Regions:
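Non-catalytic, glycine-rich low-complexity segments
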Residues: 20-48, 96-104, 111, 270-282
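Beta-strand-rich ligand-recognition modules
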Residues: 58-81, 311, 319-334
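Aromatic-lined ligand-binding clefts that engage carbohydrates, nucleic acids, or primary amines
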Residues: 43, 266, 294-322
Length: 334
């Protein structure tokens, strides 16, 4: 009896040890696209020395994790196709295609979403869906001390709902590429508006340039508290600016936004002429108030409406009869 119990116990231990899960980068997830006709790198983390078994497209591949748990393997070249299951030990990734993968990076122009160009392209966007276009946007994350090994990603297919959150440039590029290549198209959007490329470069690459060498000689860049000190100083400056603006803004004090305010002595201007505000060729910096009276026919009373005021740079707030109906705090609309 003791012998039987011993054998069963050993078998249970063996079964558990072979089912240990691996950890994968966020980019490896359902609906992903792998690059065709080139070796496919797969990597991740596991228990030290653990055996890694990869099943893909009817074949199996094996490797072993290092002493510190990292592992990687290159799958052989694949032709375009899918959908497939990519299984790594007990982790299963579904609806995987092989096609062409593009990395899109940049600043705000690369982040501008489809929903913000709907005024011009609504009919085209609402009439198009394509399961062979897959998109993922790397979520915001940063580390001022060391490079990150992982990112948070979710792959989405090109349907009328999810496409609204695609970057517009990526969306139209993917449509064109899919029509031309007739294979699955994967778009990895790794962009962050307003950030400089140096922010995402390694120290080794930046040290090739003299101006960065000088910066790295300063001890502040190796101080983990330095980023927070910069952030706090900037927040204090912004707070002080808003306090001064509130104290000095005559329009705010005298309630110029209210319907009852008498603006009969205000100057009439042409907003399409850049000389208004007392300056040549460009308006004066500061806070400007504009008032315009419009008549709404009774037949439209109570209905939804869109007020189009054009591009207002850098920021604005719009009031109707003293009620704020919209504002922009972003200097590059739409």
């Amino acid at each position: 009896m003791k012998k039987n119990i011993y054998i069963i116990w050993c078998l249970l231990l063996y079964a558990i040890s072979t089912q240990a899960e691996v950890k994968l980068p966020g980019i490896f997830s359902d609906r992903m696209v792998l690059q065709r006709e080139t070796p496919i790198p797969i990597w991740g983390w596991a228990e030290p020395k653990e055996t890694i078994v990869v099943d893909f497209n009817g074949k199996q591949y094996k490797t072993r994790a290092s002493k510190t748990g990292e592992w990687s393997i290159n799958l052989p070249e694949q032709k375009a196709g899918g959908p497939y299951e990519l299984k790594i030990n007990q982790t299963s990734i579904q609806d995987v295609y092989v096609g062409d993968v593009y990395l899109c990076s940049g600043q705000s122009n690369m982040e501008l979403t489809v929903k913000r160009v709907m005024d011009k392209y609504k009919d085209e966007i609402m009439s198009y869906e394509n399961n062979l276009i897959r998109y993922t946007k790397t979520k915001y994350a940063y580390n001022f001390i060391a490079p990150q090994e992982n990112s948070e990603n979710e792959w989405k297919t090109c349907n009328r709902k999810d496409a609204l959150d695609f970057a517009a440039l990526c969306y139209f590029f993917a449509k064109e590429m899919q029509a031309e290549k007739e294979v699955a198209i994967g778009i990895i959007n790794s962009s962050w508006g307003g950030t400089k490329i140096a922010s995402w470069s390694t120290r080794q690459s930046l040290e090739k340039y003299e101006n960065f060498k000088e910066k790295f000689r300063s001890s502040q860049y190796s101080n983990p508290d330095y980023p927070d000190s910069v952030k706090n100083a900037q927040q204090a400056q912004v707070s002080q600016w808003h306090q001064r603006q509130a104290a000095d803004d005559l329009g705010s004090k005298e309630k110029w936004i209210h319907e009852s305010f008498d603006a009969s002595d205000w100057e009439e201007i042409d907003v399409f002429n850049s000389n208004w505000g007392g300056s040549r060729n460009s308006p004066l910096n500061g806070v400007h108030y504009f008032r315009q009276r419009i008549n709404i026919p009774e037949s439209l009373a109570g209905q939804k409406a869109t007020l189009r005021v054009g591009t207002l740079k850098d920021s604005d707030a719009t009031y109707i009869n003293g009620v704020c109906v919209g504002r922009t705090s972003y200097q590059y609309p739409p």
